[in-house]
Amino acid sequence: MSYQDLKECKIITAFITPFHEDGSINFDAIPALIEHLLAHHTDGILLAGTTAESPTLTHDEELELFAAVQKVVNGRVPLIAGVGTNDTRDSIEFVKEVAEFGGFAAGLAIVPYYNKPSQEGMYQHFKAIADASDLPIIIYNIPGRVVVELTPETMLRLADHPNIIGVKECTSLANMAYLIEHKPEEFLIYTGEDGDAFHAMNLGADGVISVASHTNGDEMHEMFTAIAESDMKKAAAIQRKFIPKVNALFSYPSPAPVKAILNYMGFEAGPTRLPLVPAPEEDAKRIIKVVVDGDYEATKATVTGVLRPDY
């Protein structure tokens, strides 16, 4: 699919990787999960991102996952492949492999983690990937996970690269507003923070790359529709009820909460891979009460006052 198809996407789901109890990928669980997403307003799907537990997936496993999902999706929505690591050479090699594999609208490359590069180092990292790739690149800027932050100024330098088409931004609404105001016209801005989606869309973002859309896609779609129709009273009312659900979804290291909910809903999401562990049973029950049942009293026993902890 093309850039234009991607531009139409408002809700892109950062897809989990379903696992068997032994830690192997449960490929048989993928069709039901994908059909569930598509039935609840997912416009595009990101594979092998953070929510997919990509740090614990080998590249061979990622390619197997890509093939399985592509077979089910069959061109119905655009797909994005997670292609970046903290090793520029490895990222280049893998993005070339994914481009040759085919079937993706773009590749998502994360800001290098652990190395703590300078702004110039980050610029050169993404430039090298984009120069080498036949696949358009979206940058993933999430300092809560990688420690360093790609500044808006560096992002705008990269936005001028013809093969860097967008960013998944997980910094601040102030940064997002600055980027939206100063970016090239065709550069795509997605928030990666479910709790910020309401504000980001009102600022002019193109959409959200979401975890919550696994479980709350309908209300996200309803909120975005209300924003598009300038019904801010309705959109704000949805957002107020949505925030406790986001709090619950990120009250334990992700994707453990969303996997607990999907398992409860009858989908075979399975466990997480170490070093991540499932949410404790009592915590999982509270999370489910909030996210599925809308039991806001249960929020008193979950993380409150934040939209998304730095998990």
Curated annotation (Swiss-Prot):
It comes from the Bacteria. GO terms for molecular function: 4-hydroxy-tetrahydrodipicolinate synthase activity. InterPro entries: Aldolase_TIM, DapA, DapA-like, Schiff_base-form_aldolases_AS. It is found in: Cytoplasm. Pfam families: DHDPS. The record marks T50, Y114 as: Part of a proton relay during catalysis. Its EC number is 4.3.3.7. Pathway: Amino-acid biosynthesis; L-lysine biosynthesis via DAP pathway; (S)-tetrahydrodipicolinate from L-aspartate: step 3/4. Pyruvate binds at T51, I209. Catalyzes the condensation of (S)-aspartate-beta-semialdehyde [(S)-ASA] and pyruvate to 4-hydroxy-tetrahydrodipicolinate (HTPA). This is 4-hydroxy-tetrahydrodipicolinate synthase. The gene is dapA.
